[in-house]
Regions:
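Non-heme di-metal
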Residues: 1-183
Length: 183
């Protein structure tokens, strides 16, 4: 038995603003708890790090729930997943370069983590692509316009001019003007 959808339940209601604030607050809470986990780990408190990590995972889940309530992401999510797969794959090289920049700036302590994150981003791209393949959701872009976010590599398929002027990249939040037409 499938669960009744919560997608967009608060959209256009008096609860929309509250759900939006909760989504943002929970997302920031996840970030905070992960930062606390890193700090605790650096100080040898693995038990505290585990507690903070568990709290962060739950906060991230809560943020996703509120985002779904407001319909922040499309119900037909496969086009978004395709763009995410591209952005995640592009993120691998971007983070490798960032690790090099950290080393060049004498910030060696952070570089190994950035390299781990780079590999994880590449892995995310690969597993998302496997989902697209499994469910037959790859999009044939032949003859279609493809716009690429200059920040994260997210690909928008279609006519970006049809989107509102306040359109932002669903991955990194960059404005519409950050996209360029992929020739």
């Amino acid at each position: 038995m499938s669960k009744k959808s919560i997608h967009g339940l608060t959209k256009g209601t008096e609860l929309e603003k509250m759900a939006s604030m909760l989504a943002q607050g929970e997302a920031k809470g996840a970030m905070m708890y992960y930062a606390l986990a890193n700090l605790a780990r650096e100080q040898g408190m693995e038990d505290a790090a585990a507690v903070f990590t568990e709290a962060a995972n739950q906060e991230a889940n809560h943020a996703g729930f509120y985002a779904a309530l407001n319909g922040m992401y499309p119900r037909d999510f496969w086009a978004l997943v395709r763009g995410l797969a591209k952005a995640e794959a592009a993120g691998e090289n971007s983070l490798k370069k960032l690790a090099e920049r950290f080393r060049a700036a004498g910030l060696d302590a952070a570089a190994p983590d950035l390299e781990i994150f780079a590999a994880q981003e590449g892995h995310h791209g690969a597993i998302l692509q496997k989902l697209l393949d499994k469910y037959g959701k790859n999009i044939d872009t032949t003859g279609k316009k493809v716009y690429v976010c200059g920040c994260c590599g997210y690909e928008y398929v279609g006519d970006l001019d049809n989107e509102a002027e306040n359109y932002v990249c669903p991955v990194c939040g960059m404005p519409k003007k950050a996209f360029s037409l992929n020739a």
